[in-house]
Amino acid sequence: MLPLPRRQQQVLQATVQHYVDTVEPVGSRTLVRRFGLDASPATVRSAMGALEQKGLLTQPHTSAGRVPSPKGYRQFVDALLPEPGAAVVQLQRELAELSLQWAALDDLLHHLARRLADLTGLMSIITRPQRQEPRLKALRLVRSGDRLLVFLVESSAASSSLNLRLPPDSSAQLQALEHWLNDQLSKSAINWSGLPSHLQSVGAPLKQALASHNRGRNRQAEGALTTGLAGLLCQPEFQLTTSLRPLLQLVEQQPHELLNPAAATASGGVWIGQEHPHPALSGCAVVQAPYATASGGEGSVALVGPMRMAYATALAAVEAVAGTLSRLLA
C-alpha cells in the first residue's frame, strides 16, 4: 500500500489506539478531543471517510463511529507503530539482568511465559527448542562385563552415552564394528544397509538403541508451554462460545498450530486475522519471534490475542523474551 497522507496517518493511529483502549467505535469529535488532533472534527471526519474507502476503517453500524479493519491494523503495524511503553522498558531491564539460574529449562520457559502473559493480558506460547536429529561425528565402543558402553560425539560438540546388553561371544566384533561405524561417519552418516553380515549380531541392537535414543530426545523437546488463557478469555472478542470453541480446541490439542509455520525460518513477525493459515485464528492476531540455542535448537516465543491488540507492547515484549532466551541458551 502507498504511504498515507500525514492527516490520515494521525487519524488511523488515533482510531486504533482508541479502539484498543475502549473496544468502542469512535467518531471524529472524540478523536479531536482525546488525542488533541490539530484539525477540526469535519477535517477528521473527512480523513476517516477516506480511510474507510481504502478499507482501513469500517463502520459496524450506520449510526456508530468507526473501528479499524484487519487491513487497517496491518497498516498500523507496518508504518505507524509507536514506541513501547514503560512496562516493556521495565521488562527489558529485568531480562537484561536475568541469568540461567533455573535447574530445568521448562522452569525458565514457564517463568518467561507467565511474565509475558501478565504484562500483556494475552495468551503466551513458548515452544521448547527443536533441533534436527544430531549428526554423529564419532563414537567409541567399550565393553564392561556383559554390557556395551557407547560414547557418542555429535556435530554440536555435545556428547552422550548409551548402555546396552552385549550378545554372547561378541567381543571380537567390537573393534571391527567401531572401525566400520567411524568410517561411515567420516563420510556423512551411517548407512546401516551396508553393515557387514559378520557384524550384524552387535550392529543390529546398536542401531535400535541409537534410534530409540534419538526418538526419546525428540519427544522430550516436543511441546509448547502456554499460559494466560484466562486473560485471553476476558477479552470481549472471546465472550461468544461459538467463536471461542475452535480456539480452545486448538490450544488444548495442537498448541504448535497457534504459531505461524512461515516464521519457523524467518525473523518472526505479526499475523493479523486471516493472514494466519489456521481458520481458528481468523479473528485473532499472533505476534511471534524466534530464538536459537548453542546446540542448533530453534524455538518460538509468541502472544495470541484479539486483533484489537497493543501491538507495540506485544511485539517489543516478544522480541525481548526471544532475545533473552537466545542469550541464556547460547
UniProtKB/Swiss-Prot annotation:
Q: Which Pfam families match?
A: HrcA
Gene3D superfamilies xrefs: 3.30.450.40, Heat-inducible transcription repressor hrca homolog, domain 3, Winged helix-like DNA-binding domain superfamily/Winged helix DNA-binding domain
- List the molecular function annotations (GO) for this entry: DNA binding
* Coiled coil feature spans: none
Q: Which InterPro entries match?
A: GAF-like_dom_sf, HrcA, HrcA_C, WH-like_DNA-bd_sf, WH_DNA-bd_sf, WHTH_transcript_rep_HrcA_IDD
Keyword Transcription set for record: yes
Q: Which UniProt keywords apply?
A: Repressor, Stress response, Transcription, Transcription regulation
The organism's place on the tree of life at top rank = Bacteria
UniProt keyword Transcription regulation, yes or no: yes
Q: Which GO terms describe its biological process?
A: negative regulation of DNA-templated transcription
Please describe what this protein does. Answer: Negative regulator of class I heat shock genes (grpE-dnaK-dnaJ and groELS operons). Prevents heat-shock induction of these operons.
What HAMAP family does the record point to?
HrcA
Entry's family note: Belongs to the HrcA family.
Q: What is this protein called?
A: Heat-inducible transcription repressor HrcA
